[in-house]
Amino acid sequence: PTETEWEYAARGGRDAAGNGNKFSGSNTLENVAIYSSNSGNQTSVVGSKQPNEIGIYDMSGNVWEWCNDWCDENYYAQHPSDKNSPTQNPQGTNSGTGRVVRGGSWNDVDFNCRSANRFGYGPEYRLNNYGFRVSRTK
């Protein structure tokens, strides 16, 4: 998915977007994620924790998920009231050295599993706590 699609899904869609949850589906990470405190240092079966508001599992924790967008650390730095701000109409940047990864993993602390958290890594970056989610846009 694009980073925008990923975040929309992680935050539970349009109806749940304003609920203030730090993690996908809850403010309590233990309810929805496999992360450093409960992972046993490995990935877990998909769906072993509660889904978010739209029924999607593991958007927080288990494995970092690659997004299609290039990562620009300053992309969201524009003021949100600016009509050209990416917070109003996110399209992603056209180039970069790394792709966006979201969601945190079994090897991460709670802060890294927040729905708002993002990092960028080169596509050659391969570890056992990275993966991807197949998605389709209608």
What does each model-found stretch correspond to?
Residues 31-56:
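A short, contiguous structural element within a folded domain that forms the immediate neighborhood
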